[in-house]
Amino acid sequence: MLERIKGCFTESIQTQIAAAEALPDAISCAAMALVQSLLNGNKILCCGNGTSAANAQHFAASMINRFETERPSLPAIALNADNVVLTAITNDRLHDEVYAKQVRALGQAGDVLLAISTRGNSRDIVKAVEAAVTRDMTIVALTGYDGGELAGLLGQLDVEIRIPSHRGARVQELHMLTVNCLCDLIDNTLFPHQDD
């Protein structure tokens, strides 16, 4: 059992090292897209399922409240956080539309959709991205594995941050780290001299 535990840590560390080599440019581009949207008076919509939903909510909470330093609130909405809306849509057997309907209702040109999907194939996330395209929104996609269907939907101005792993747990761990990096970059770009 102890060797298995050590193996989990080792695999996580190795994935982090690979991501540190592969992802800085994509993370930087994503952060700049998010910053530019906020500077233009737009907002960030976030969505995901399961652990990805938790990461989406963590991002939105860090924007609205704060990440590590006190600063003004920033507009972000986790589309998976409103249970009444979610259950109303799924009650009508529109599971695949659970986020797309919200994107069509709330999304505006210049907004960003932060779409988080471990494999990139979740139908409701794919539909949300398709809806964001029709609203002229920028998409930042956090994926893993081969990027899935999401990777094929992205345009030139969109950004995919694909975790270099085919293990769901490692992808999800690195998604959380990536979300924290994005929050840090946004704060340090918009509020460079803020202290705790």
Swiss-Prot record:
Protein's UniProt name: DnaA initiator-associating protein DiaA
GO BP terms: carbohydrate derivative metabolic process; DNA replication
- Keywords, comma-separated and alphabetical: DNA replication
Q: Where is the signal peptide?
A: none
Keyword Membrane included in the entry's annotation: no
Keyword DNA-binding among UniProt keywords:
no
Question: Family assignment?
Answer: Belongs to the SIS family. DiaA subfamily.
Q: What Pfam families does UniProt report for this protein, alphabetically? A: SIS_2 (PF13580)
The record, for CDD domains, names: SIS_GmhA
This chain's function reads:
Required for the timely initiation of chromosomal replication via direct interactions with the DnaA initiator protein.
Q: Could you tell me which residue ranges the SIS domain spans?
A: 34-196
- Its quaternary structure? Homotetramer; dimer of dimers.
One of the record's GO molecular function terms: carbohydrate derivative binding
